[in-house]
Amino acid sequence: MKLAFLFPGQGAQAVGMGQALAERFPAARHVFETADRALGYRLSDLCWKGPIEELRKTVHTQPALLTHSVAAWKLLDAAGVKPSWVAGHSLGEYSACVAAGALDFEDAVRLVHRRGELMYRAGLDRPGTMAAILGLERTQVEEACARAEGAGVVCPANLNGPGQVVISGERAAVVRACELARGMGAKRVIPLEVSGAFHSPLMGSAAAGLTEALAAVSVHDALIPVVANVSAEPLRRGVEIRAALEAQLLGAVRWEDSMRRLIADGAQGFVEVGTGTVLRGLLRTLDKSVPSWSVDDPDGLQATVSALAGAAGGVPLTGDSEPMEEAG
């Protein structure tokens, strides 16, 4: 079975994330310990003990989600469950790049920590907000944003699936676009609790800083295609992946297009790797017939490996194999 691995972005974080995997599997615990050393503080304690108010800060949320995803991916890889493609939603694109061999994990965890700092500062420099609009076509949301531009900057930021688009921009313009969306028949309009107008021009200073941070690390040619947020195109060359990551903070996450591209290219199953099941839910709005699994904890790992190890030519998940042995 040809698999695509999907890696979640911000919003999925929760106290306890990754703890069960790390307690049971030394390979997962090693990933968290590596992140702690790379960052110079106990990210693992924050993930497992909270408080949630600290974990929700984007400077912590981003490395936390990346670390949980990479820990779960390492266990899948050791069990022989391997993807033909990877994709990640916003921050999750960095996790996808690690799984594809385009980024080294220690570089990636420091990068997303820096990305969080830059995004937070950009939100202070140019305050903004975001909102989810449910029940309208993408073109209708684009029209609402265009009509609201007299109130300021506003644009589609996350094209998540049929009838689900997140907009981003200056507060007055977002409020106006939401009013227009309601008038067009939107089923729901949900203001989001965020520290800035992510994936919009208001992130300009963050994008510039991120370009500098990316210039300091190696972005390798990928071993498997990474489907980029900004283009929904599969990328392999390191120079293309670097450019896509640089463009991502200012551009929309074309998630629906990315999933449709993966299905069209032959993906027969999807595995959400890391915290939560949001991406599986979005996938079901596109195509309920495509099988999917999620690996958040040991139960999800066991179920996924049991279902896929044979199809992927892998080995069963047991406590006897060295990469997967359980901690005492």
Describe each model-derived feature in a short phrase.
Residues 318-328:
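Long, low-complexity, intrinsically disordered segments
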Residues 77, 182, 263-266:
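Non-catalytic positions within long, well-ordered alpha-helices that form the structural scaffold/packing
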Residues 10-12, 39-41, 100-252:
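Alpha/beta catalytic cores of group-transfer enzymes, especially the acyltransferase/condensing modules
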